[in-house]
């Protein structure tokens, strides 16, 4: 099974956040990061693997499904 690429990860993150009613500010607070930084990672402007893994874990997604 091929790994999902960044657009799949971005969509899945946004879907989980919407479904679970998690705001960017709440996610940023959980990860001790700024909301601007979180948005830039989610939208693909920053490719921080570590942050993507932490966002995935915080939202209950399997980070291994999104390895590029």
Task: List the model feature ranges, each with a label.
Residues 1-22:
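A short, Lys/Arg-rich alpha-helix, primarily the initiator
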Residues 11, 49-50:
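A generic alpha-helix surface/boundary motif
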Residues 27-28:
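Short alpha-helical "recognition helix" segments of helix-turn-helix
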Residues 33-47:
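Recognition helix of helix-turn-helix/homeodomain-like DNA-binding domains
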Residues 50-65:
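DNA major-groove recognition helix of helix-turn-helix/homeodomain DNA-binding modules
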Residues 68:
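Phosphate-coordinating loops and pocket residues in cytosolic domains that bind phosphorylated ligands
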């Amino acid at each position: 099974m091929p790994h999902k690429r960044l657009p799949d990860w971005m969509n899945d993150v946004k879907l989980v956040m919407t479904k679970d009613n998690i705001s960017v500010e709440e996610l940023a607070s959980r990860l001790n990061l700024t909301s601007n930084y979180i948005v830039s990672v989610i939208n693909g402007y920053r490719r921080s693997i570590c942050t993507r893994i932490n966002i995935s874990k915080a939202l209950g997604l399997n980070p291994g499904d999104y390895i590029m």
